[in-house]
């Protein structure tokens, strides 16, 4: 089949890769001049299935109020009066209870664990290089309450069969030696030894080369205007320079997917703004070994070959890409507090991007009510973690194969009866009938 993918971030490019591997004729279009130039450009770099956690969690509403008065708050909300923003925040609020949190985290971990297996296989099959490390990740706790609350996440990890190590403060340096000096500031940590790290942009650009060699066509500097519809089918994509057609269409445009699909498919995907700093390593012994995640500030510090990436935070501010000095200061403060002298803080690249976030934290992967339109979006802060698994899953669905993991509760149909997180059954048999 001829398939047109809209978007060339890590989600769009991995979608292209897995689809061409199944014999499809694939074209990818993007408004940028090359792949991975927006949300995939400078994320935190962690591939962390066990830390796949929804932002909508018990206690978040109260914490959000407290964070409003903190200088280094991990979450900032700036109301703009739009119905889009208000509706999304209300939907997220409805997920901030224990039962919804457990359902959402279980879904996310399931997909993220599968995705980690997929990237391992991809690495074995292709030898792709992206400054990746397989040294695990370490969540750091600064309070006893954070340490005690880890038991809730551990229950989900055990349910999903994810290996973990709960460490007291004096044991943290056995995993991250450079943290020896900071043990007195921390109460402990949760290590996930099977997690990975790597440069998402580098991975995506390398995979573009491999996908092109396999037959995928990439068309850049191509602005998508709208989807053309006839009945329950998409008949083309209107671009600035003409119409493109295919048998099937995949929307992988991150936070911009919502506007493109307006009036066709209603998806609750909102742009959650995040920031990162990247700096050269000046003392390897003072730098992280892999990724350390500061639970208090929701900031990840990741080691690449010769660089440190510090990323995190979330702002509910719409499509705003202004770089705020205060956020730069927060990122700098955290890395200097935990890994002083590891990187050159005077030579940093400051970046911001918009993560496509759903209120329940779970991405939207799979078919729609339009027979030949598929979605791969809404991965939030976990696009890098979930990319390969989501795209392998989507390729199997489009090809009529049974996915390796349960996928019904990942599709847009979970929102059919208004916003909720209850499973709306959508069988593969019904999907086949819709495609017919």
Curated annotation (Swiss-Prot):
Keyword terms, alphabetized: FAD, Flavoprotein, Oxidoreductase
Catalytic activity: a D-alpha-amino acid + A + H2O = a 2-oxocarboxylate + AH2 + NH4(+)
Annotated signal peptide: none
Gene3D superfamilies: D-Amino Acid Oxidase, subunit A, domain 2, FAD/NAD(P)-binding domain
Protein name: D-amino acid dehydrogenase
Function comment: Oxidative deamination of D-amino acids.
Matching NCBIfam families: PRK00711.1
Residue numbers binding FAD: 3-17
Database matches in PANTHER family: D-AMINO ACID DEHYDROGENASE, SARCOSINE DEHYDROGENASE-RELATED
Pathway membership, UniProt: Amino-acid degradation; D-alanine degradation; NH(3) and pyruvate from D-alanine: step 1/1
Gene Ontology MF terms in the entry: D-amino-acid dehydrogenase activity
Entry's EC annotation: 1.4.99.-
Annotated Gene Ontology cellular component terms: cytoplasm; plasma membrane
The family this protein is said to belong to: Belongs to the DadA oxidoreductase family.
Enzyme class: oxidoreductase
Gene Ontology BP, a term: D-alanine catabolic process
Record organism: Photorhabdus laumondii subsp. laumondii (strain DSM 15139 / CIP 105565 / TT01) (Photorhabdus luminescens subsp. laumondii)
Cofactor entry: FAD
